[in-house]
Regions:
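Residues lining hydrophobic/aromatic ligand-binding pockets adjacent to catalytic sites
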Residues: 1-242
């Protein structure tokens, strides 16, 4: 596969999934599958479906083979692992083995916690250590409880090389700012004011572009648009490239 040429190497830009609505197919044209066409324009994607159901290793291998050498995937850790009161080690082992089918194109494992999941050091230590013992992929977490957004927890994440997602809209103060390990900056844009549906306007995208430029000058930086419900994600990602 030829390498994606439209995005600077230090910035990973994409959407959650790679569905391209018909209205945007002229901007993401050419031959091939939706993923092949998508990957000619954007250099990253986030696989969210893994949160709800497993995929075969052969499916991950197929996705990897459909993309350029420089393309990278972020994969969301299953909710059976992140939303359980006890770590489901069998589920985690299966997920890691399956997603390893992406090979070198596996860039990040994304851990999203339930909104009521408080920071409990022993629980967090157990989960993140289990992940890091099984994979060399970078880790990003998206907590949604206020207890995760303290300087002490930020330092705890930094020490363990775990990035904290910058999520918009912010559920709690500072949730829209990247935190934790500074070697990875991961932005997730869910859509505002209507989450998953609303497109971001030009003023927001211009401001975001400045933030991404500053972040990517010193860190691997990901920007994933998750406002996919009405097709706004691909529009916003393409406009950010313009």
């Amino acid at each position: 596969m030829e390498e994606a040429a439209h995005v600077k190497a230090e910035l990973r830009l994409g959407t959650a999934g790679w569905n391209v609505p018909r209205v945007w197919k002229e901007r993401v044209g050419g031959v091939g599958s939706q993923l092949e066409r998508y990957a000619r324009v954007l250099n990253a994607t986030e696989i969210n479906s893994s949160f709800h159901k497993p995929h075969r290793r052969s499916t991950y291998e197929k996705w990897a083979n459909a993309t350029p050498d420089d393309f990278r995937f972020s994969v969301k850790v299953p909710k059976s692992v992140t939303h359980s009161s006890q770590l489901a080690q069998g589920e985690l082992d299966r997920f890691v083995e399956e997603s390893a089918g992406l090979g070198a194109k596996l860039g990040v494992l994304l851990v999203q916690f339930a909104p009521r999941k408080m920071f409990v050091e022993s629980d967090a230590e157990f989960l993140f250590r289990a992940l890091q013992e099984r994979t060399s992929a970078a880790l990003a977490c998206e907590p949604r409880h206020v207890s995760w957004f303290t300087s002490e927890v930020g330092a705890w994440l930094r020490e363990r090389r775990i990035a904290r997602v910058a999520a918009d809209p912010a559920r709690v103060p500072d949730a829209d700012l990247p935190g934790g390990w500074p070697g990875l900056r991961y932005f997730r844009l869910h859509g505002a004011p209507r989450i998953y549906y609303s497109a971001y306007d030009g003023a927001f995208l211009r401001s975001l572009k400045v933030r991404l430029g500053a972040a990517s000058s010193s860190s691997e930086t990901w920007c994933i648009f998750d406002n996919t419900a009405a097709g706004a994600a691909i529009e916003n990602a393409l406009d950010l490239l313009a």
